[in-house]
Amino acid sequence: MNRFSTRLMGATATPPPAPPKARSNENLDKIDMSLDDIIKLNRKEGKKQNFPRLNRRLQQSSARQFRMRVRWGIQQNSGFGKNSLSRRGRVMPGKRRPYGVITGLAARKATGIRKGISPMNRPPLSDKNIERYFPALKRKANLLRQNEVQRKPVAALKRPNQLNRKNNIPNNFTRSGNKLSHQKDTRQATFLFRRGLKVQAQLNSEQLLDDVVAKRTRQWRTSTTNGGILTVSIDNPGAVQCPVTQKPRLTRTAVPSFLTKRDQSDIKKVPKGVPLQFDINSVGKQTGMTLNERFGILKEQRATLTFNKGGSRFVTVG
């Protein structure tokens, strides 16, 4: 009895923990639900329990990916669907990157430009705007300038002022038009000589040297003197050059003066020309009429013919 009483006392002293109402309600709901709905609910509960751990992992991996992308210049917008990247930045099998992917420094510039500024309201690229919006570019440009200044050779700075002038006239600038034309002729001569043409250039070298200082005219304004004449002789290999043999001449005996005919000078030679079918002068000789008389007769004949026919629209004036 004592043992039994002690057990009862212990049971009354420590009441059993009551189950939570929420679980009991859920269990009651699950009884009424179908099997598929119960499986879905269990999955959701499992996801909720594991969510904080997964969320922490995702945050760490996203931060690591962002660092790697910034370091290697990978485009941040990996995208979704066909061209999406996996968590490690690799292209998934069967998925390709688009052709217009911007990488490297261009991607950084593009992201910098896009931030907070619409493409319509972008400021023009001046020094002030570069300092304001792209300080990294400004620093890079300054570093490049410093490097260029350091690379300049010291020997160039020690040159005399006369050599450092930009407006120095070259030594060969004193060529005149005649000298240039002489060079042109020689070039033309070599061009023709290579093609089997013999060229004889008649050039007065002394005159050319004298005119170098005196004349400074342009090539197309030079006077046509004996300085630019070219005589070209073309070889004809088909023609056979044989030495001309002197044929024996037949010497005629002189005819005495009394045998020559004197009547040849008296006869008038008719000049050769186009033979006419009739004599023009014969027309006037045969008729003995003037042209006015002839046309007058024709007019009268025409008038009589028209009068005999009757009225006509034409009036002949005699």
Swiss-Prot record:
Q: Which Pfam family, any one of them, does this sequence belong to?
A: FYTT
Instruction: List compositional bias (Polar residues) regions by residue number.
Output: 163-180
Which residues does the record list as Phosphothreonine (modified residue)?
14
Q: Where is this motif: UAP56-binding motif?
A: 27-45
Q: Which residues carry this modification: N-acetylmethionine?
A: 1
Gene Ontology CC: one annotated term: nucleolus
- Region entry Disordered: which residue ranges? 1-27, 163-183
A GO biological process of this protein is: mRNA export from nucleus
- Self-association and partners: Interacts with DDX39B/UAP56 and NXF1; interaction with DDX39B/UAP56 and NXF1 are mutually exclusive. Interacts with SSRP1; required for its recruitment to mRNAs. Interacts with CHTOP.
Which family is it part of?
Answer: Belongs to the UIF family.
| Protein's UniProt name | UAP56-interacting factor
Give the species this sequence originates from: Bos taurus
Which gene carries the instructions for this protein? FYTTD1
